[in-house]
């Protein structure tokens, strides 16, 4: 019995201690390296701010540090706000720079057209000689297989400067740009697409200058980059993550089939593959030096002719029957590069087709697609080239039995299908003079189609894929430096103390360096981290504000002006939001803020030594709204308590006791009590009145004669005085007015006594009826009291037993230590005596030796 009682006592003690000590409360931390995905506007930075499209970008000085994070993060090049912004911004710059001309010439009028002589295309031989930069046909523009463009001469009538007269005009058109009633391109013709365009503004010739810029995150936000070499556009668990404030430089070249002058080329071939379908973007190995050179021979003139006031028509005299003929040739080890693409595809984890590279073929899109899909479409100094890549594909696939070569015939078009939005733009005819442009081929846009036995790499016209390759390994995050975690400390009442010591600012990304550290280690440096965070945000805001001030006159020119303002506003909103949130919780100017709000889930606790703050944030994200609401309610209650406490403190001043405003509340309480008593008396009176009515009595305010019949009050009849007149004297029928109120008061007292007596008897009867229940409750309370006494006795006995055990332990320890000390002292004495006896022993030994 005794051991069981001791075990019960120990269990009770442990349980009580756990209930007291293990209670956890919500603690707010500020300056924690945690984040969530964001989708806010980015702004640009560039080295070349002289071009029209980048004049409002921040100056780039290459001082953008990257910090390695020991975290795991998900990346997706297609579901990515960074790439989506790049696609939209490049499209806007492209549209604004090129300025499509929607004032068609010669509008929608009937034209009489005839095919010019000698415009048939020259047939190409079955085999074509491979050319390079030293080939003579390049300079002479007569390489084998380059035919002439089909041209039709048209004339039409239209009013000119003289509105009442019509004038005849002549013009040369490509046969593919007109629709005629005869199949051979003659007869009555109309310009193709003339009824699908809208007249809105005039246009001039512009160059599409290649612009390189980088995106930067606004203050309070950051960019993460997947640094894994095996990253293929979709990676749910990238373990090599770095944090940066800006992206790498990106190229704004637009084209189909190929990507030119990209910044992602490496000494290897790798593939970005869409997570849900067969869309890919293939980065080519820069080791093979793949280039493309395009040329449009010159000696052509474009002469504007005025049709009428404010409207111009551009005529194209034909000199060499090739007004829009251009061509491109490819240099580098293309055959080996394409072979490496096939080998890389066969090893890709997403690929499920044949591993035989001989059955993996490059193919062009099917017939019937838009020209931008059927042909390779690119921009060369503001002109749009459409190149037939059949010869080129036969060459890289080594199809010697078909026409093949390393160059492709191209033509320039005015009617262009837009690449980002559905629509058609019409541009001015080609400018005069020779056009040349050189580009480095860095990627291939393709769709992978596999049926198990054969795989086709079909070239694609998805221009947007180019920017997914450029920036697909980045993601934008919003830094959330205010997380919650449970701790055993509870808030104590004290005034918040501001830290006044300065800290060295490492930049906005400095505090993210601890993102991979354990929660306990990261929380130890909160003071420096939070101040670094705030200082970095303020610094970035100031830089943006300076740029906006310098360029406020040009904000309307490009998309960057608006994005800079948006970034500035976003940064201020985030900073104010964080500070307002901390203030609403009563945690302003605190890095670690303990609260009185209990932790909602005791089973959900962090591993301070092994868990990062980012991992903890993902686990408790669903509790954020409830905890935030509880913290706000606790702070409101705390403010109410402080207000009441401050009001009580006002009584410490002796002069406040004589302040009438301090007593108004208590005076009000007294008035309320008096009014309540009066109301109670009125209620009792009404109850008694109703009670008398039920028993057949007349109301107490009936006439005196009727009332005196029930309560007989006899009075003596008074004699009139001698001086009274006849009018003053009279018979009052024996009634006196003054005795009646006294008897009535006695009557009310009697009724009140009976009422109270009745209430007392009723309550006593009710209690007597509930005596069994009271006895049962009394017995239960007695049993509980006995049980508590028993447990208290157990607890007292256990405490006495523990105290006795401690006293016995203390006695034993004291005796043991005393014995050990005595033994140690005796041993030290013996050693000392032995040391002191050494000279004597030596002397005695010497004496014996001498004897």
UniProtKB/Swiss-Prot annotation:
- UniProt function note: The surface protein gp120 (SU) attaches the virus to the host lymphoid cell by binding to the primary receptor CD4. This interaction induces a structural rearrangement creating a high affinity binding site for a chemokine coreceptor like CXCR4 and/or CCR5. This peculiar 2 stage receptor-interaction strategy allows gp120 to maintain the highly conserved coreceptor-binding site in a cryptic conformation, protected from neutralizing antibodies. Since CD4 also displays a binding site for the disulfide-isomerase P4HB/PDI, a P4HB/PDI-CD4-CXCR4-gp120 complex may form.
Task: Give TM segment ranges.
Answer: 670-690
Per the entry's comment, what about the domains?
Some of the most genetically diverse regions of the viral genome are present in Env. They are called variable regions 1 through 5 (V1 through V5). Coreceptor usage of gp120 is determined mainly by the primary structure of the third variable region (V3) in the outer domain of gp120. Binding to CCR5 involves a region adjacent in addition to V3.
Question: What ranges does the record give for the region V5, renumbered to this chain?
Answer: 453-459
Please give the sites of covalent lipid attachment annotated as S-palmitoyl cysteine: 763
Q: What's the gene?
A: env
Glycosylated residues, per the record, are 37, 70, 114, 127, 134, 142, 157, 184, 195, 227, 230, 261, 267, 278, 289, 299, 355, 361, 388, 398, 401, 438, 453, 456, 601, 610, 626
Give GO terms: molecular function aspect only. Answer: structural molecule activity
Q: Where is this region: V3?
A: 294-327
Q: Which GO terms describe its biological process?
A: clathrin-dependent endocytosis of virus by host cell; fusion of virus membrane with host endosome membrane; symbiont-mediated suppression of host innate immune response; symbiont-mediated-mediated suppression of host tetherin activity; virion attachment to host cell
Note down the stretches annotated as region V1: 113-153
Region feature (V4): 387-410
> What else is on record for this protein?
Some HIV-2 isolates have been described that can infect cells independently of CD4, using CXCR4 as primary receptor. These isolates may have an exposed coreceptor binding site. This isolate is from a Gambian case of 'neuro-AIDS'.
Topology feature Cytoplasmic, residues? 691-851
- Which stretches are Extracellular in the membrane topology? 25-669
Q: Where is this region: V2?
A: 154-194
Signal peptide extent: 1-24
Per the Swiss-Prot or TrEMBL annotation, the motif Di-leucine internalization motif is positioned at 850-851
Task: List the ranges annotated as motif YXXV motif.
Answer: 697-700
Which protein, by its recorded name, is this?
Answer: Envelope glycoprotein gp160
Q: How is it modified after translation?
A: Specific enzymatic cleavages in vivo yield mature proteins. Envelope glycoproteins are synthesized as an inactive precursor that is heavily N-glycosylated and processed likely by host cell furin in the Golgi to yield the mature SU and TM proteins. The cleavage site between SU and TM requires the minimal sequence [KR]-X-[KR]-R. Palmitoylation of the transmembrane protein and of Env polyprotein (prior to its proteolytic cleavage) is essential for their association with host cell membrane lipid rafts. Palmitoylation is therefore required for envelope trafficking to classical lipid rafts, but not for viral replication.
Q: Does the keyword Cell cycle apply?
A: no
């Amino acid at each position: 019995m005794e051991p069981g009682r001791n075990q019960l006592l120990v269990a009770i003690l442990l349980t009580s201690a756990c209930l007291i000590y293990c209670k956890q409360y919500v603690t707010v931390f500020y300056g924690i390296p945690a984040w969530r995905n964001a989708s806010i506007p980015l702004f640009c930075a560039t080295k070349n701010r002289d071009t029209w499209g980048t004049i409002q970008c921040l100056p780039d000085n290459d001082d953008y540090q990257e910090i390695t994070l020991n975290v795991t993060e998900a990346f997706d090049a297609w579901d990515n706000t960074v790439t989506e912004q790049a696609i939209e911004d490049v499209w806007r710059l492209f549209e604004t720079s090129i300025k499509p001309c929607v004032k068609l010439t010669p509008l929608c009028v009937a034209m009489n057209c005839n095919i010019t002589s000698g415009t048939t295309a020259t047939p190409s031989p079955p085999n074509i000689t491979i050319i390079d930069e030293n080939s003579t046909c390049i300079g002479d523009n007569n390489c084998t297989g380059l035919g002439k463009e089909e041209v039709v001469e048209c004339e039409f009538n239209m009013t000119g400067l003289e509105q009442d007269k019509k004038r005849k005009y002549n013009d040369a058109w490509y046969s593919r740009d007109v629709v005629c009633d005869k199949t051979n391109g003659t007869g009555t013709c109309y310009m193709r697409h003339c009824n699908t365009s809208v007249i809105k503004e005039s246009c001039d010739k512009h160059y599409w200058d290649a612009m390189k810029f980088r995106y930067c995150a606004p203050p309070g936000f950051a960019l993460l980059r997947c640094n894994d070499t095996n990253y293929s556009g979709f990676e749910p668990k990238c373990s090599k993550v770095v944090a940066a404030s800006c992206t790498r430089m990106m190229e704004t070249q637009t084209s189909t089939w190929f990507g030119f002058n990209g910044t992602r080329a490496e000494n290897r071939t790798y593939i970005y593959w869409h997570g849900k379908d067969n869309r890919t973007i293939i980065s080519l190995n820069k080791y093979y030096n793949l280039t493309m050179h395009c040329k449009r021979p010159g000696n052509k003139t474009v002469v504007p002719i005025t049709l009428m006031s404010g409207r111009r028509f551009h005529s194209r005299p034909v000199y060499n029957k090739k007004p829009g003929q251009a061509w491109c040739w490819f240099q580098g080890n293309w055959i080996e590069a394409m072979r490496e693409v096939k080998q890389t595809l066969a090893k890709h984890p997403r690929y499920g087709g044949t591993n035989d590279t001989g059955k993996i073929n490059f193919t062009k899109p099917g017939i019937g697609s838009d020209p931008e899909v059927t042909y390779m479409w690119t921009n060369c100094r503001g002109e749009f080239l459409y190149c037939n890549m059949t010869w080129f594909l036969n060459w890289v696939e080594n199809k010697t039995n078909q026409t093949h070569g390393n160059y492709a015939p191209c033509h320039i078009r005015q009617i262009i299908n837009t690449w980002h939005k559905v629509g058609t733009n019409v541009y001015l005819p080609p400018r005069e003079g020779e056009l040349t442009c050189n580009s480095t081929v860095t990627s291939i846009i393709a769709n992978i189609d596999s049926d198990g036995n054969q795989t086709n790499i079909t070239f694609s016209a998805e221009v947007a894929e180019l920017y997914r390759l450029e920036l697909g390994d980045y993601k934008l995050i919003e830094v959330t430096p205010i997380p919650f975690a449970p701790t055993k400390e509870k808030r104590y009442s004290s005034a918040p103390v501001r830290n006044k010591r300065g800290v060295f600012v490492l930049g906005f990304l400095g505090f993210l360096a601890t993102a991979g550290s354990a929660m306990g280690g990261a929380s130890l440096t909160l003071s420096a981290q939070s101040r670094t965070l705030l200082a970095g945000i303020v610094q970035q805001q100031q830089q943006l504000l300076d740029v906006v001030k310098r360029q406020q006159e040009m904000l309307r020119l490009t998309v960057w002006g608006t994005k800079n303002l948006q970034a500035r506003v976003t940064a201020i909103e985030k900073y104010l939001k964080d500070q307002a949130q901390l203030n609403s919780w009563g945690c302003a100017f605190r890095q670690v803020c303990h609260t009185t709000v209990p932790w909602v889930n005791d089973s959900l606790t962090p591993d301070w030594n092994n868990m990062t703050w980012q991992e903890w944030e993902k686990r408790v994200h669903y509790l954020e709204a409830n905890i935030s609401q509880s913290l706000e309610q606790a702070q409101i209650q705390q403010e109410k308590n402080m207000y009441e406490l401050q009001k009580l403190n006002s009584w410490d001043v002796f002069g406040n006791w004589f302040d009438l405003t301090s007593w108004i509340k208590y005076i009000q309480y007294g008035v309320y009590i008096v009014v309540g008593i009066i109301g109670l008396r009125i209620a009792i009176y009404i109850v008694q009145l109703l009670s008398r009515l039920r028993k057949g009595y007349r109301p107490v305010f009936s006439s005196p004669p009727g009332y005196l019949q029930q309560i007989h009050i006899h009075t003596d009849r008074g004699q009139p005085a001698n001086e009274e007149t006849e009018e003053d004297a009279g018979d009052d029928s024996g009634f006196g007015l003054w005795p009646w109120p006294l008897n009535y008061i006695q009557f009310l007292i009697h009724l009140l006594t009976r009422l109270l007596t009745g209430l007392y008897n009723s309550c006593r009867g009710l209690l007597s009826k509930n005596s069994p229940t009271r006895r049962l409750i009394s017995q239960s309370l007695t049993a509980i009291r006995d049980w508590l006494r028993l447990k208290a006795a157990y607890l007292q006995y256990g405490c006495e037993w523990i105290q006795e055990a401690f006293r016995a332990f203390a006695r034993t320890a004291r005796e043991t230590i005393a014995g050990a000390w005595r033994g140690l002292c005796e041993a030290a004495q013996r050693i000392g005596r032995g040391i002191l006896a050494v000279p004597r022993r030596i002397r005695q030994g010497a004496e014996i030796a001498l004897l």
